Amino acid sequence: MSDMHSLLIAAILGVVEGLTEFLPVSSTGHMIIVGHLLGFEGDTAKTFEVVIQLGSILAVVVMFWRRLFGLIGIHFGRPLQHEGESKGRLTLIHILLGMIPAVVLGLLFHDTIKSLFNPINVMYALVVGGLLLIAAECLKPKEPRAPGLDDMTYRQAFMIGCFQCLALWPGFSRSGATISGGMLMGVSRYAASEFSFLLAVPMMMGATALDLYKSWGFLTNGDIPMFAVGFITAFVVALIAIKTFLQLIKRISFIPFAIYRFIVAAAVYVVFF
């Protein structure tokens, strides 16, 4: 693979990762399709995907840095704006409660989960995740019990964490699972999305660090330029995608995302079967 060709592939996959990682459409499904079409598969490709995920995570850190530092008691300048109608405040405990279920299951069944990474499982996950998004829109309370991020209860955070376990099924979408779970638990669409992004930082950093540790042997010095391009591209695109997404969901429901998931599932079927 020529240098320019590999850098082009890195940029394309970085765009795909950045666009889809935090939207409820399954980045895994997209990466499988695009990687296959580009002929970029195997151990190096898996390591590359782990590295560019770090770029996407960094975008969330940049977007929510004041809120993230606030969770650990570090404040800069003016007090963090309160988001909600109650006098509550989102705390680190909410994040920990949201992490526990998936962390426990992920550690117990890590190898089993990795064995599920194949097109047929991803295709089914895309469909089921789309149905969950539709169910969340149809069954959510008419008036959210937690309109803002700071209105969330510990119970809601834990239940969102339980829904996050669905994302251990490759192709389901972590954001799709957590946002749907939040809405069904009475959290507003916007607040559920924000919580999903915040929850992504420790969850994805932990999972990515573990995967990177296990895949480090496949990384060579010659891969560094390609990995750097993918990382930077994923970071920039994810930053734009998150900002756009948070504005978009103020005006539309998740039904279009569900329909799009069904289209991607059909694409997986066409490409692989």
Curated annotation (Swiss-Prot):
Has keyword ATP-binding? no
Query: Which keywords describe this protein according to UniProt?
Result: Antibiotic resistance, Cell inner membrane, Cell membrane, Cell shape, Cell wall biogenesis/degradation, Hydrolase, Membrane, Peptidoglycan synthesis, Transmembrane, Transmembrane helix
Chain ranges passing through the membrane: 6-26, 45-65, 90-110, 116-136, 190-210, 222-242, 252-272
Record membrane topology: Multi-pass membrane protein
- Write out the catalysed reaction: di-trans,octa-cis-undecaprenyl diphosphate + H2O = di-trans,octa-cis-undecaprenyl phosphate + phosphate + H(+)
Asked if the Swiss-Prot or TrEMBL record annotates the protein with the keyword Electron transport, the reply is: no
Q: What is this protein called?
A: Undecaprenyl-diphosphatase
Return the similarity comment: Belongs to the UppP family.
Give the species this sequence originates from.
Escherichia coli O7:K1 (strain IAI39 / ExPEC)
Can you list the GO cellular component terms from the UniProt entry?
A: plasma membrane
State where the protein is found. Cell inner membrane
Q: Where is the signal peptide?
A: none
Pfam families attached to this UniProt entry: BacA (PF02673)
Recall the GO molecular function terms of this protein's record.
Answer: undecaprenyl-diphosphatase activity
Organism superkingdom: Bacteria
Q: What HAMAP family does the database record attribute to this sequence? A: Undec_diphosphatase
Fetch the InterPro entries from UniProt: UppP
This molecule's function is given as: Catalyzes the dephosphorylation of undecaprenyl diphosphate (UPP). Confers resistance to bacitracin.
What EC designation does it have?
A: 3.6.1.27
GO biological process terms held by the UniProt record: cell wall organization; peptidoglycan biosynthetic process; regulation of cell shape; response to antibiotic
